[in-house]
Amino acid sequence: PGLALPGSTPWRTITVGENLKPIVETTIPWDVVEPLYPTEHTYKMGRGTWSWILWQDGSINFDDQKKYVDLAAAMGYEYVLIDNWWDTNIGRERMKDFIDYAHSKKVDIFLWYSSSGYWNDIVQGPTNYMDNPIIRKKEMKWLHNIGVKGIKVDFFGGDKQETMRLYEAILSDADDHGLMVIF
């Protein structure tokens, strides 16, 4: 096999260390890959806390999430990810107050969303925001306006071209509103 020049190949990297620090703080993926699309905003990567990994769905409530904001602040972390059910357990109407509290501690917030769509039958909310471009853009405008820093979009239906287009559409719309994205 040959490679026409100038050529490129996908990068594969492994990061190892005696503790988690070099793994979570590595910048290798950003150092070796040129961005496919330019962004309108400058984004700051950082560390965060996430209650769901330990406490699961029951932790998605105002009081427990405040504890995670306090933990992030005490550790000097930049972010807290609030997982599924935030829309019902904390409430959209209370989210601005919650974000104001987080900002008072110098912590930013990521919120979880289902990718939704016909392929997706999960019940965890919020659902039906990310698969429709009109609804998605309206939601991202709201997120930006209340001070959310990013979103985690979860439960995609495979890796077909349609799904890859949805990934790109979410990234493009998020960039229009200055939101970072975790998939």
Regions found by a protein language model. Give the residues of each.
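Aromatic- and carboxylate-enriched substrate-binding clefts and catalytic-loop regions
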Residues: 83-183
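Conserved structural scaffold segments of CAZyme catalytic domains across common CAZy folds
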Residues: 1-110, 116
